C-alpha cells in the first residue's frame, strides 16, 4: 500500500519509522492544494492535519485512497459527501473522549488568550518593540474572582473550567445538551443569554454543527456588559460582523480567538481577520495553534497510527 504524509513538519519520527517499514511511504511538506487533491488518485492512505481542505474536491475522478488519517478533533474541512461517495474511511480524533482527556493544549491556550487579553499583553509587547516604555496606558484586569461563563461543557469546556477555578473564578456553564439530572461542579445556566448577561469573561467550547453555526450573534451579544469573549472552538460559531459591532459598541471589552470563519478555504476573507489588520481595539487572533504543540503531535500521531493498523489488520 502507498502512503502519503502530506504535512510532515514536526511529525513523529517513531510513526514515520513504523510506516516506512510496512508501507511504500512518501513524506512531503510542500504540496499545493491541487497536488494534494491529485494524491487521492495515487495513494491508498493519506495523512494530513489542517493545512488543506477537502470541501471542493472533484468527486468524478477515479479515487484510489481508502484511508484518510487526520489527527484532529474538528473535521469541518473535510467533505462527508466526498468520503462516502468514494468509500474512504476517515480516522480522526473526533469522539475519542478517553484519549483526549490527556490532550490539554487547547484549554491551556484558552487561558493564555484570556490573560493576554485582560492584561493588554500583546499590545504592550508591541509597544515596547517600538521603543516605548509606557506602563500606565496598559493597565489591565485581574482574572482572580471574576465571573466566568463557559459555553459548551464537553471535554474542553470541563478542562478549561477546572483551570479557571484555580483562579477562584465564579463559574457558570451552559450546554444545550444538559439534562436536568446532570451533575456538574459549577452553576448551570438554563439559557445561553444568561451567560452573556451576568459574566465578565466568556469562553466558547462548542462543536460546529447545524445548531451551533452562528450561535453567537447580535441577538446574544446585546446582553454583554463590557465582557471579555474568547473563542477556541470554531470560527463559524460566531457571526463575525456582529462581534465587530459589539467590540465597537463596547459591549465587548476585548475579544480573542484561535479560529476564524472559513479559515480552511480562505482566511483572508474572514471579517475578523480583515478588521484586526487595522483596528486599534483590544483583539487577539492566533492562527489555530491551540492544539499545536510538540507533545500533542507525538501523542495523537501514535494514537491514530494504532487505529489505522488495527483497521488494516482486521
Question: Can you say where each PLM-predicted feature lies in the sequence?
Answer:
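Rossmann-fold NAD(P) dinucleotide-binding segment
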Residues: 52-65, 211-229
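Rossmann-like dinucleotide/phosphate-binding beta-alpha-beta segment
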Residues: 1, 136-226
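Structural alpha-helical scaffold elements that stabilize or flank donor/cofactor-binding regions
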Residues: 38-39, 61, 194-195, 220, ...
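N-terminal glycine-/charge-rich "phosphate-binding" loop or analogous flexible N-terminal tail
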Residues: 1-45, 168-172
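Rossmann-like dinucleotide-binding domain for NAD(H)/NADP(H)
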Residues: 96, 170, 226-227, 233-314
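Short acidic/histidine-rich motifs immediately flanking catalytic phosphotransfer sites
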Residues: 40-45, 62-66, 197-202, 225-227
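Short glycine-/small-residue-rich Rossmann-like dinucleotide-binding loops
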Residues: 51, 73, 200, 205-208, ...
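Phosphate/diphosphate ligand-binding glycine-rich loop within oxidoreductases
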Residues: 44-125
Amino acid at each position: 500500500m502507498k502512503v502519503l504524509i502530506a504535512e510532515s513538519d514536526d511529525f513523529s519520527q517513531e510513526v514515520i519509522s513504523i510506516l516506512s517499514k510496512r508501507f511504500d511511504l512518501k513524506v512531503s511538506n510542500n504540496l499545493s492544494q491541487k497536488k494534494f487533491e491529485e494524491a487521492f488518485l495515487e495513494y491508498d492512505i493519506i495523512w494530513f492535519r489542517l493545512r488543506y481542505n477537502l470541501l471542493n474536491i472533484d468527486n468524478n475522478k477515479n479515487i484510489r485512497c481508502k484511508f484518510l488519517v487526520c489527527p484532529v478533533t474538528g473535521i469541518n474541512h473535510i467533505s462527508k459527501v466526498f468520503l462516502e461517495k468514494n468509500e474512504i474511511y476517515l480516522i480522526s480524533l473526533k469522539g475519542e473522549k478517553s484519549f483526549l482527556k490527556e490532550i490539554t493544549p487547547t484549554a491551556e491556550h484558552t487561558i493564555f488568550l484570556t490573560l493576554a487579553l485582560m492584561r493588554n499583553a500583546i499590545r504592550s509587547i508591541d509597544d515596547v518593540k517600538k521603543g516605548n516604555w509606557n506602563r500606565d496606558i496598559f493597565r489591565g484586569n485581574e482574572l482572580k474572582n471574576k465571573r466566568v461563563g463557559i459555553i459548551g461543557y464537553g471535554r474542553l469546556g470541563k478542562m478549561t473550567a477546572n483551570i479557571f477555578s484555580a483562579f477562584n473564578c465564579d463559574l457558570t456553564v451552559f450546554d444545550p445538551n444538559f439534562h436536568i439530572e446532570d451533575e456538574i461542579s459549577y452553576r448551570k445556566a438554563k439559557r445561553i443569554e444568561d451567560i452573556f448577561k451576568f459574566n465578565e469573561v466568556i469562553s466558547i467550547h462548542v462543536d460546529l454543527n447545524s445548531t451551533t453555526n452562528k450561535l453567537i450573534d447580535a441577538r446574544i451579544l446585546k446582553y454583554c456588559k463590557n465582557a471579555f469573549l474568547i473563542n477556541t472552538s470554531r470560527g463559524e460559531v460566531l457571526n463575525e460582523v456582529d462581534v465587530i459591532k459589539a467590540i465597537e459598541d463596547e459591549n465587548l471589552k476585548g475579544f480573542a480567538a484561535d479560529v476564524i470563519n472559513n479559515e480552511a478555504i480562505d482566511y483572508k476573507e474572514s471579517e475578523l481577520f480583515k478588521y484586526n489588520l487595522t483596528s486599534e481595539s483590544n483583539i487577539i487572533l492566533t492562527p489555530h495553534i491551540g492544539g499545536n504543540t510538540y507533545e500533542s503531535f507525538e501523542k495523537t500521531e501514535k494514537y491514530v497510527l494504532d487505529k489505522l493498523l488495527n483497521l488494516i489488520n482486521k
